[in-house]
């Protein structure tokens, strides 16, 4: 089974990426957090892989930016009712450290923010992940409401993403290039500057 891939980012889609390893393209399913953190097209990426086989779908590769992400994905799927889609959804809203914190606080509401995860399944996840090694670091008892709270984005960032989407750029790609541009240009960046930088990153 494949455990890790290092290669050039050939394509980035809504739910997957194509990684070119010495001329062989691997389709890797990734959550939105992982996709947003991939480097630009043509640049080298390293993904930790969980390989799964089923008679209906064949071999599927699930990619993660860190070993902890992959471990959390495996631990989540060991719970009855949690498949790959639900596990990815949980990790889209909670990092492994945030998930460990939610489990320690028995905060099923935080877990229940994941798409497709109802109250009963969220409770089962919180209950069954207790004492599981979700993260290598210390578990922080973060106050409710602070778990997975996304930093406030300046309005120009959202406007730039919307503008790129209006030009036909997929949302995940638009967010990735705009966030990268915002990090380089700083908080004072204008919408126009972010759009221009984003288009340059996309090669348009």
Curated annotation (Swiss-Prot):
Residues 152-204 are annotated as: Domain III. Disulfide bonds: none annotated. GO terms for biological process: DNA recombination; DNA repair. Residues 143-152 are annotated as: Flexible linker. Its main location: cytoplasm. GO terms for cellular component: cytoplasm; Holliday junction helicase complex; Holliday junction resolvase complex. One of its GO terms (molecular function) is four-way junction DNA binding. Residues 66-142 are annotated as: Domain II. Residues 1-65 are annotated as: Domain I. Keywords: Cytoplasm, DNA damage, DNA recombination, DNA repair, DNA-binding. It is found in: Cytoplasm. The RuvA-RuvB-RuvC complex processes Holliday junction (HJ) DNA during genetic recombination and DNA repair, while the RuvA-RuvB complex plays an important role in the rescue of blocked DNA replication forks via replication fork reversal (RFR). RuvA specifically binds to HJ cruciform DNA, conferring on it an open structure. The RuvB hexamer acts as an ATP-dependent pump, pulling dsDNA into and through the RuvAB complex. HJ branch migration allows RuvC to scan DNA until it finds its consensus sequence, where it cleaves and resolves the cruciform DNA. Belongs to the RuvA family. Homotetramer. Forms an RuvA(8)-RuvB(12)-Holliday junction (HJ) complex. HJ DNA is sandwiched between 2 RuvA tetramers; dsDNA enters through RuvA and exits via RuvB. An RuvB hexamer assembles on each DNA strand where it exits the tetramer. Each RuvB hexamer is contacted by two RuvA subunits (via domain III) on 2 adjacent RuvB subunits; this complex drives branch migration. In the full resolvosome a probable DNA-RuvA(4)-RuvB(12)-RuvC(2) complex forms which resolves the HJ. Has three domains with a flexible linker between the domains II and III and assumes an 'L' shape. Domain III is highly mobile and contacts RuvB. This is Holliday junction branch migration complex subunit RuvA. The lineage of its organism: Bacteria, Pseudomonadati, Pseudomonadota, Alphaproteobacteria, Caulobacterales.
